A protein has these predicted regions:
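Alpha-helical transmembrane segments and immediately membrane-proximal extracytoplasmic
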Residues: 1-326
Length: 326
């Protein structure tokens, strides 16, 4: 019987598969990875991330206030003139027509802009879980820039506060922050907007804590301070570091002058209280008027301001320049 011939290659043992060895990890590489992961974990903790977010909110709020002030100045130059004594027709027509346009926008386009920005921000904190519609930010920007720039006796602080709160609310919702952080983020933005408007971060922090939050919170104080400071730094980068009011150097010549300052403080507080009482008295009466008067109320106020401005142009606008020149 002939033997079956088996090919030599058939009985050759198969080559062992190549085993890939993982690259050697040195002790230095392990330390670098550990430090990187520890740094990321440190930064990504929500409380620390919230502080970084406060700086971002301050920057965006500061930019918004810069644009807001430039819009007011552009509107004033366009509708009135660069001087404080523009021509007679412009003094009367500019605030009147601007009031009519503001009424139309507030009724049909931006209904959320009506009322006090401080009260709306407080409602957002305690009722709406920090929610401020971004359309309110746009509406406040447009209507208030038009109203103040046309000469109506309004200040940019209140709309700046609400715009800052709205910007913070938008950023917080976009990042899906927790409900607790969303409630706190509106006052953070409010402080940033107010600080940039006043160029005074400390005053803005104290105002927001007292008026918007109502209580001292150690957890939110750091974020509020960071937002206020970063917004002022941003604003000063574009508009300069000049204070809102320049106070000349003075010294007390005699102790008797302190009595005059006490009287001045009492008189100023009394005048402010009287103005507040007038506002409280007239507001419900105006709200009781027929709804169609909403279209003409801002125009009527603008007409009254324009008529007064013919003789006293200092009453038109925010009035900062007049106070600074006093």
């Amino acid at each position: 019987m002939s033997q079956l011939q088996v090919p030599a290659e058939a009985v050759t043992p198969a080559a062992a598969p190549e085993v890939s060895h993982p690259p050697k990890v040195t002790a230095g590489a392990l330390r670098a990875r550990w430090k990187a992961s520890a740094a990321v974990a440190f930064i990504m903790r929500e409380d620390r991330l919230f502080l970084l977010l406060a700086v971002l909110i301050g920057i965006f709020s500061g930019l918004a206030v810069v644009c807001f002030r430039l819009a007011i100045e552009w509107t004033q130059i366009t509708l009135l003139s660069p001087s404080l004594a523009p021509s007679f027709p412009r003094v009367v027509l500019a605030p009147t027509l601007a009031g009519l346009v503001v009424a139309l926008l507030a009724i049909h386009v931006f209904p959320g802009v009506r009322g006090s920005g401080v009260n709306h921000t407080k409602a957002a904190v305690y009722i709406s879980n920090g929610y401020v519609p971004f359309t309110t930010v746009i509406g406040k920007f447009v209507t208030c820039a038009l109203a103040i720039g046309s000469g109506q006796s309004l200040g940019p602080e209140d709309p700046s506060l609400q715009m800052g709160a709205g910007i913070a609310s938008l950023i917080g919702r976009s990042l899906r922050l927790s409900q607790e952080k969303l409630r706190l983020i509106a006052p953070v933005g409010a402080a940033a907007g107010l600080a940039a408007a006043f160029n005074a971060p400390i005053s803005a922090v104290l105002f927001v804590i007292e008026e918007v939050i109502g209580t001292w919170s150690a957890g939110g104080l750091g974020a509020i301070v960071l937002a206020a400071v970063s917004s002022v730094v941003t604003m000063r980068a574009f508009l300069g570091a000049d204070s809102l009011f320049r106070v000349p150097a003075f010294r007390v010549a005699s102790p008797g002058e302190l009595l005059a300052y006490i009287v001045l403080g009492i008189a100023g507080g009394g005048a402010s209280l009287f103005l507040l009482k007038l506002f409280v008295y007239f507001r419900p009466k105006i709200q009781e008027l027929p709804s169609w008067t909403l279209y003409i109320q801002p125009a009527a106020a603008g007409l009254l301001i324009g008529l007064i401005g013919i003789r006293l142009p200092q009453v038109m606008g925010a009035g900062y320049a007049i106070v600074d020149q006093a």
